[in-house]
């Protein structure tokens, strides 16, 4: 395992946040839970599964828990693959301005992000 790449993972997430589009501004944001209260639409909060490090075939090894996504956030699953397509690492949690993205190149890895707001712990199903 390349520890220097693991230490750079937060930098990758920060760069991704700066480049991604906002979930709430997307035209196809159909997974948001919207309730109408007193004739005003209200976006409900969503709880997300959180895990900072999970390797293939193993349980979550760091950062297991639940986070609460604000109206600007979504539940997210990030998966890193080696260039040959073999899975290397999975991480999940709440992410601001989340967007579904495939194939971001990061060193010798490819990274995919999937986002949801359809129900509590929806990122367990992605």
Swiss-Prot record:
InterPro entries: LY6_UPA_recep-like (IPR016054). CDD domains: TFP_LU_ECD_PATE1. One of its GO terms (molecular function) is acetylcholine receptor regulator activity. Residues 1-21 form the signal peptide. Disulfide bonds join 48-75, 51-60, 67-94, 98-115. The keyword Signal applies. Keywords: Disulfide bond, Secreted, Signal. Belongs to the PATE family. This is Prostate and testis expressed protein 1. It comes from Homo sapiens.
């Amino acid at each position: 395992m390349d520890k220097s790449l693991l230490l750079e993972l937060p930098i990758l997430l920060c760069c991704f946040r700066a480049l991604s589009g906002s979930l709430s501004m997307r035209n196809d944001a159909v997974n948001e839970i919207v309730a109408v209260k007193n004739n005003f639409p209200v976006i409900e909060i969503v709880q997300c599964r959180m895990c900072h490090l999970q390797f293939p075939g193993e349980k979550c090894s760091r950062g297991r828990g639940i986070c609460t996504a604000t109206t600007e956030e979504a539940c997210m699953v990030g998966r890193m693959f080696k260039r040959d397509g073999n899975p290397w690492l999975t991480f999940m949690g709440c992410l601001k301005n989340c967007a579904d993205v495939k194939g971001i190149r990061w060193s010798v890895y490819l990274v995919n992000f999937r986002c949801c707001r359809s129900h509590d712990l929806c990122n367990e199903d992605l």
